[in-house]
């Protein structure tokens, strides 16, 4: 009998979770696809909004660029490079946070996406399939475990050897 791949195990987990919730798999997948498409629309709107900043020249009116108007040309080149470097850093930093927020919203919908879903997510975010897989793996690891019945305290069950009065009742094997 062939061994189960992780994808098969995740499908089984999805079926079990859907059965526990009292919904069919088709309903669960349909609801997931609606939530994923709505979050994708949000991500595209935010990405479009963020892409306007470097091209449209909106940053020219900021105080940094106003400050550069009074600087002589020989010094302005140095400041210009530094500010462009800083703006590029901010532009790279903000989309990374948007990607994290987007992936986090998708994690709330489905913590075990299929390979096809991960590939699509990677294409939308501009990251590789491996990065998406690693992100979901790390996020699942950080997720608090809810399976334990108690608050994490370990129980000690004494063995017959350590319980009081058990020395007399124990029988030791004879040495050869």
Curated annotation (Swiss-Prot):
Positions of region (Disordered): 141-176
Say if the entry is tagged with keyword Ribonucleoprotein: no
Q: Which residues bind DNA?
A: 88-147
Q: Output the CDD domains linked to this UniProt entry.
A: homeodomain (cd00086)
List the Pfam families hit by this protein, alphabetically.
Homeodomain
Under Gene Ontology molecular function, one entry of this record is: DNA binding
- One GO term of the cellular component aspect? nucleus
Query: Which of UniProt's keywords are assigned here?
Result: DNA-binding, Homeobox, Nucleus, Repressor, Transcription, Transcription regulation
Q: Which SUPFAM superfamilies match?
A: Homeodomain-like
Keyword field contains Transcription: yes
Q: How does it assemble?
A: Forms a heterodimer with ALPHA2.
**Protein name stated in the entry:** Mating-type protein A1
């Amino acid at each position: 009998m062939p061994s189960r791949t992780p994808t098969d195990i995740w499908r089984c987990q999805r079926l079990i979770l859907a059965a526990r919730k009292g919904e069919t798999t088709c309903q669960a997948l349909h609801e997931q696809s609606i939530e994923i498409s709505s979050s994708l629309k949000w991500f595209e709107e935010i990405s479009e909004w963020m892409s306007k900043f470097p091209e449209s020249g909106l940053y020219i009116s900021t105080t940094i660029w106003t400050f550069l108007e009074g600087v002589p040309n020989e010094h302005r080149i140095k400041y210009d490079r530094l500010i462009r470097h800083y703006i590029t850093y901010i532009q790279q930093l903000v989309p990374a946070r948007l990607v994290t927020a987007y992936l986090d919203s998708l994690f709330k919908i489905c913590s075990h996406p299929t390979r096809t879903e991960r590939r699509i997510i990677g294409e939308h975010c501009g990251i590789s399939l491996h990065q998406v897989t690693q992100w979901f793996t790390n996020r699942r690891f950080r997720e608090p475990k809810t399976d334990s019945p108690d608050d994490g305290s370990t129980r000690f069950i004494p063995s017959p050897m350590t319980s009081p009065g058990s020395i007399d009742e124990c029988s030791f094997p004879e040495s050869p």
